[in-house]
Swiss-Prot record:
<feature type="region of interest" description="Disordered">
    <location>
        <begin position="120"/>
        <end position="165"/>
    </location>
</feature>
<comment type="subunit">
    <text>Part of the nascent polypeptide-associated complex (NAC).</text>
</comment>
<dbReference type="InterPro" id="IPR038187">
    <property type="entry name" value="NAC_A/B_dom_sf"/>
</dbReference>
<dbReference type="Pfam" id="PF01849">
    <property type="entry name" value="NAC"/>
</dbReference>
<dbReference type="InterPro" id="IPR002715">
    <property type="entry name" value="Nas_poly-pep-assoc_cplx_dom"/>
</dbReference>
<feature type="domain" description="NAC-A/B">
    <location>
        <begin position="33"/>
        <end position="97"/>
    </location>
</feature>
<dbReference type="InterPro" id="IPR039370">
    <property type="entry name" value="BTF3"/>
</dbReference>
<protein>
    <recommendedName>
        <fullName>Nascent polypeptide-associated complex subunit beta</fullName>
    </recommendedName>
</protein>
<feature type="compositionally biased region" description="Acidic residues">
    <location>
        <begin position="134"/>
        <end position="143"/>
    </location>
</feature>
<keyword id="KW-0805">Transcription regulation</keyword>
<comment type="similarity">
    <text>Belongs to the NAC-beta family.</text>
</comment>
<keyword id="KW-0804">Transcription</keyword>
<dbReference type="GO" id="GO:0003729">
    <property type="term" value="F:mRNA binding"/>
</dbReference>
<dbReference type="GO" id="GO:0005739">
    <property type="term" value="C:mitochondrion"/>
</dbReference>
<feature type="compositionally biased region" description="Low complexity">
    <location>
        <begin position="144"/>
        <end position="165"/>
    </location>
</feature>
Length: 165
């Protein structure tokens, strides 16, 4: 090997200045995830308690629902602090409404009215559907009788025509 290559290799392994010990490779420092530990210690100071047996948490924000299934819920009522941890799923309110309608109380009545109005705006022909169904039902009704006319005479007239062809 020539001298230039050796000097280049020597410079890459030296971690300090002139006169320091050479290392074969640089030490890689691991970055520890202290964020979670710091958060847990802060929550412990606030005094949160774990709330068991919560199957689902829904956070409503405009027309979007952030849904947590089987989350870990911690709360400190005195500090008005709620911690919901888990994997969130963002869904539209219209998609999740049939599942959560039983959970909604009377305080959400205004929101339900707004949703109903939005559905009617999205489907403008929705109000006309009962009228069209009613017209189709009229076809199944028995026609009114006409005085002097029977069903037997048209049937006898059609029978010879069918036999001729």
């Amino acid at each position: 090997m020539n001298r230039e290559k050796l000097m280049k290799m020597a410079n890459t392994v030296r971690t300090g200045g002139k006169g320091t010990v050479r290392r074969k490779k640089k030490a890689v420092h691991k970055t520890t995830t202290t964020d979670d530990k710091r958060l847990q210690s802060t929550l412990k100071r606030v005094g949160v308690n774990s709330i068991p047996a919560i199957e689902e948490v829904n956070i409503f924000k405009d027309d979007v629902v952030i849904q947590f299934i089987n989350p870990k819920v911690q709360a400190s009522i005195a500090a008005n602090t709620w911690v919901v941890s888990g994997t969130p799923q963002t869904k539209k309110l219209q998609d999740i409404l049939p599942q959560i309608i039983s959970q909604l109380g009377p305080d959400n009545l205004d929101n339900l009215k707004k949703l109903a109005e939005q559905f009617q705006k999205q489907a403008p022909g929705a109000g006309d559907v009962p009228a069209t169904i009613q017209e189709e039902d009229d076809d199944d009704d028995v026609p009114d009788l006409v005085v002097g006319e029977t069903f037997e005479t048209p049937a006898t007239e059609e029978a010879p025509k069918a036999a001729a062809s």
